[in-house]
Amino acid sequence: MREHLTKSSRGCERRYCSSSSQNVRGAAQTDVVMTTSGLTSTTAELPVVGPFDLRDIAMMGFGHRDERSFDGVMRMAFCLDGDYERHVGVAAQQVGDRLELKVKSLGDPLSDTEVEALRKQVARVVSLDHDGEAFHQLCLSDPVLARIHMKAPGFRPALFYSPYEAALWSIISARRARSQGITLRGRMSELYGASFELSGTATLCVPTPSALLEIESVSGLPADRILRLHAVAQAAQRGVLDADRLGAMAPEEAQAELQQLPGIGPFYSSLIVIRACGHADAPTVGEPRSQAAIQQAYGIDHELSDAELLALAETWRPWRTWVSVMMRALAA
């Protein structure tokens, strides 16, 4: 196994990680692999309840993800929940009624607490933190939902890796084409973040909050966006962007708090809370593509008001978020 470290012009380390040798076992970890280069590997599993298809989730095309093919592995590289100061890479593969995770991390082996945090984070990202069978039954009870759901019964919402990364995406991608946002995220991650080789493919991870604060410029990003990224990093360091904390708050309360961050308005605060914290039943309004898909699916010949949309969504409880995402992704 090799770990290649190069210095950017700002003096930040860029980490590129590839494969391995020597096995070590830990109490809550299996197949841990360590080398003197400082890269550690381990494995973990997540149970699958209800219909679930990792391909549908990996290919959703959400945020920075823009996969054009699926080889059976969903590759994820992110800042670990908590203080977001540790990079990890995960290659996830569905095997029957479980998700197998091959994990790579830099530095010391992940502690038992960190392994559990990682499992919880991945479960949230691929929506395995909820009872998929209950969602399946709700969809079958509504002829309109059933027709759409059965196009891809294993589909579930793909989420941002964390509120921290959703906030970064909000700043980077605002008022520009999604493809441009993907390019800028990749550029920043390559220079100041980390890159893990996951099942033969290099996968980039955004900078940690401390590294983000060291950035003075990124080609293509205006100076005011850099200042906004610094504000996101500082918020993460204060615990404002903790996923559990935000997820425990009422969505509207969390959104109001996030709007105190420069560059985060109503739309992006909703994106962070609903699409990064794991809410399954937060009502979604003010999202034109979802609303258009809902109107088409139900044969509604006029533009729904927010009140009408909320009234219709009452029948989807406790899965209003999942239904809205499913409508947008599959209705066409």
Locations of regions flagged by a protein language model:
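Extreme N-terminal basic, low-complexity initiation segments
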Residues: 2-14
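HhH-family (HhH-GPD) DNA N-glycosylase catalytic core used in base-excision repair
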Residues: 9, 17, 21-25, 29-332
